[in-house]
C-alpha cells in the first residue's frame, strides 16, 4: 500500500501503516484514529445525438491525443451526475441531459471507480473544451477503437452499442483487468 499522509489530521502526530481491520491502514497511534483512504471517483457521460456518440481527443496527459468519453474526477461535495455535466461542458462545450447511470467500471490497480451516465446532447453542437484538442460525434462504424484513451470508455461504448440493438439500456458493471 502506498500512502503520502505523514501526519494525523486530528492531533498532528506522525501516522504509521498498521495492519488492522484485515488490511494495512494509516493509523495514528497517539489518538488511535484510523485514516481511511478511498478510491478516486471519476464521473463522465456517454452522450448521444441522433445515432452518434460524443468523443473528445485529450489535450492533457495521461493519454494526450487519444479519444475518450468526457469524464474527470468528481469534485468535493459534488453529485456524480453534476460532475458528468460539468466535465462534458469543460471538454466539449455542450449541454447534456442525464438519463441514467449506465456503467460502473472498477480499476482497482489505479484505485479508481468510473461512473458513466447515459446522456442526451441538448443540441448537436460540440466545441473544443480547454482539455480537448478536438470534440466530435461518431457513428458506431466511425469510432476510433484503437485510439481510445482508456478501457473504461471502450467498455461503456461496447456496452452501449450492444444495448442499442435491443433498445434496452441496462446499468452495467465492469472491471479492468477482467477476471
What are these regions (language model features)?
Residues 67-72:
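Conserved acetyl-CoA binding element of GNAT-fold acetyltransferases
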Residues 63-66, 139:
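Short, basic/glycine-rich phosphate-binding loops at helix/coil junctions
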Residues 1-62, 73-90, 94-125, 163-179:
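N-terminal leader/linker segments that precede catalytic domains of diphosphate-processing enzymes
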